Regions:
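Short, solvent-exposed amphipathic alpha-helices that sit
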Residues: 23-43, 85, 129
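Short hydrophobic segments within beta-strands
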Residues: 11-14, 77-78, 158
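Short beta-strand segments enriched in small/hydrophobic residues
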Residues: 7-20
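Hydrophobic alpha-helical
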Residues: 32, 51-108
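Short beta-strand elements at the ligand-binding edges of bilobed clamshell
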Residues: 1, 115-127
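Hinge/cleft segment of the Venus flytrap/periplasmic-binding protein
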Residues: 19-20, 36, 125-171
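Short beta-strand elements in bilobed, periplasmic/extracellular small-molecule ligand-binding domains
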Residues: 10-11, 33-56
């Protein structure tokens, strides 16, 4: 974990109408908190809610306020696909001492990864996930076969050194 010796880390959450924007984010947060409580119980997780409908100016104000209030935070995790919100803010404000871990290989996240404002991205092979869903539906509906309700998928940890070698469309 990038925050091994820190006392406090930031958890950025995308919210819509005051609630976490997706079930996926909710599940990731639950797993993250469980992991942290078992392995790093003394690390305080400080949340920052970012409304999905906010403007870039609004994001900047929220982030400036957050980092002014929490000057010792050096690590951030985002559980949605918008790590670039923090990454772009760090570039604009020339903050080079904060690491961000995010999800999803979207182009803006990849740009921030290449520039060094995002440290890591977890990529999840969306094409493979989609293929496996359709395959399971076919087996269940057409072939009348029982399908496993759990489908574990590989992930990849992307850094600026390997991001250009990631093949997102590979099955």
């Amino acid at each position: 974990l990038i925050a091994g010796h820190d006392k406090e880390i930031m958890l950025m959450k995308q919210v819509k109408n005051g609630k976490v924007a997706s079930r996926q984010q909710e599940n990731r947060e639950q797993g993250f908190r469980h992991y942290m409580s078992e392995h790093f119980p003394k690390v305080k997780i400080t949340e920052l809610d970012i409304p999905a409908e906010e403007s870039n100016l609004g994001y900047g104000k929220k982030l400036e306020s957050f980092f002014s209030t929490h000057p010792n935070i050096r690590n951030c995790i985002t559980l949605g696909s918008k790590a670039y919100i923090v990454g772009e803010f760090l570039l604009k404000t020339n903050r080079r001492n904060i690491q961000i871990m995010g999800y999803d290989m979207v182009e803006k996240n990849a740009q921030c990864l290449r520039k060094g404002s995002v440290s890591f991205l977890i990529a999840q092979h969306a094409y493979m996930q989609g293929y496996n869903c359709v395959d399971s539906l076919f087996k269940a509906i057409v072939l009348n076969k029982k399908v496993d309700p759990t489908n574990y998928m590989p992930i990849e940890l992307l850094t600026k050194e390997n991001v250009d070698f990631y093949r997102r469309t590979q099955l």
